[in-house]
Amino acid sequence: MTPEELSAAISACLKDAVSTGEIALTESAVPDAVRVERPKNRDHGDWATNIALQLSKQAGMNPREFAGILSNHLQGIPGVTGVEIAGPGFLNITVDAATAGALAKAIVEAGASYGTNQALAGRVVNMEFVSANPTGPLHIGHTRWAALGDAIARVLRASGADVTAEYYINDAGSQMNVFANSVLSRLHGRGVPEGGYPGEYIRELGDEVLKAHPGIRELTDEAALPVIRAAAYEAQMSDIKTTLAEFGVEFDVFFSEKELHDAGAIESAVARLREQGHVFDDGGAVWLRTTDFGDDKDRVMIRANGEPTYFAADAAYYLSKKDRGFTEKIYLLGADHHGYINRLKAIAACAGDDPEVNIEVLIGQLVSVNGAKLSKRAGNIIELKDLISWLGKDAVRYSLARFPADSPLTLDPELLKKHSNENPVFYVQYAHARSRGTARNAAEAGVDRSVFDASLLDHATENELLSYLGSYPSIVAKAAELREPHRVARHLEVIAGAYHRWYDACRVSPQGEEPVLDVNRTRLWLNDATSQVLANGLELLGVSAPERM
């Protein structure tokens, strides 16, 4: 029995109790799905639910009285062997081995879809993350959001949301002029201009520009700068996209700030927000009255000299997302952008959206790496591509995904390079590789999945493993709800541990001249179910599931 099947069965029992008048609720008040969880202490049963605590007040009943009535109905669910009322009204449910073991077959048959759900179906989400300036290579400061943003997008999609992963290119404004001037200066051997970009990559970009425009040095600086700006920008964005691909991060949209300006979107945004009564003029400048919606001060949109501010572009960009049909806009920003939360929410409110529903701003803390070498090529920073070459994509992505975004993080390269159980990514990947090796050995021994007898999965380690496999869908749903993919990573580690214990206690393949029995065939189902869940979870984290290690 899967958690979803038990959930539906409890809901049906509750509706029966309502229809007989034992519980005074309207049928519409009964949820179609009742949340079930694994109790922390397995002596308390296989599954637990707090539905009596949730609905008893509405029914005008004591929670334990409510639980007692529901308990009588639950006893009739096929496979349920016991129901106990605990504490103020929790229901602890025990199922027989055959009912519990049936989950293994259900997982294998579900395949890659096991763990997915439709909790967020109908939600149209724009997720903007990384959005590094196209003035240099991706570095460690961008790495955490690349890994986490992609993982969050994956768990949201696994929960039914329609997600667009978007990279906002800051290709307008003064920093692009500084960037172009830095390349120009290097082309003419002038060194780094004041306030310019250092690093060997600037020289490399100059070589790219020279290759595309051999006569660039003969032009005046004024004539050369627009050419250099365009060519160096294209080369740098190509480098960024290549690095993201190497890191396994895919974006659906690369959105240009410059195109906002060129299309007149800034002026349009000011006009729209003025029509809604949120724009005012003062001191020759145009302002947005964001203090009406919790911001600490009103924000300038158009300076007195007629130049739009970055904030104006932020407002136009938000309206673009709204116009493109995204009802939810998620921004993933670094720790130095904490002040952006209120101003972005104020923009949403000025645009007529609910800032508590239509916009979400996630702030991440910094990440560092012990012993990492600074890249002179990039101006004494740690490049993402160097990190991938040094530690491997999987180690970096998994390590970044297994911690909450708001916790500071220091990666330990020595740990991440170890092939031992101390290394979390190795521990999980090895469990998957071991399960695939077990399947190959079983095939050589003549063990197949022609028979499945769930009642044979009665060993304590099998019960433990099944319980964690059964919890996986709820973990994915919770990870999506809270934007916390680390929940998936941590649960995979729990599954890996349970699998290794089961592997040591229960053989899939017969030994020597022993015949192939139904217990071997049934255990192969459990082995393959574990393999499937580990692969599904690693996929959500953007990490490979190796066949061999």
UniProtKB/Swiss-Prot annotation:
Motif ('HIGH' region): 132-142
Chief location: cytoplasm
SUPFAM superfamilies per UniProt: Anticodon-binding domain of a subclass of class I aminoacyl-tRNA synthetases, Arginyl-tRNA synthetase (ArgRS), N-terminal 'additional' domain, Nucleotidylyl transferase
Family annotation (InterPro entries): aa-tRNA-synth_I_CS (IPR001412), Arg-tRNA-ligase (IPR001278), Arg-tRNA-synth_N (IPR005148), Arg-tRNA-synth_N_sf (IPR036695), ArgRS_core (IPR035684), DALR_anticod-bd (IPR008909), Rossmann-like_a/b/a_fold (IPR014729), tRNAsynth_Ia_anticodon-bd (IPR009080)
Keywords, in A-Z order: Aminoacyl-tRNA synthetase, ATP-binding, Cytoplasm, Ligase, Nucleotide-binding, Protein biosynthesis
Disulfide-bonded cysteines: none
Any one GO MF annotation of this record: arginine-tRNA ligase activity
GO biological process entries: arginyl-tRNA aminoacylation
Subcellular location: Cytoplasm
EC numbers, comma separated: 6.1.1.19
Pfam families attached to this UniProt entry: Arg_tRNA_synt_N (PF03485), DALR_1 (PF05746), tRNA-synt_1d (PF00750)
GO CC terms, sorted: cytoplasm
Catalytic activity: tRNA(Arg) + L-arginine + ATP = L-arginyl-tRNA(Arg) + AMP + diphosphate
Family: Belongs to the class-I aminoacyl-tRNA synthetase family.
Subunit structure, interactors included: Monomer.
Protein name, as recorded: Arginine--tRNA ligase
Organism name: Paenarthrobacter aurescens (strain TC1)
The gene coding this protein: argS
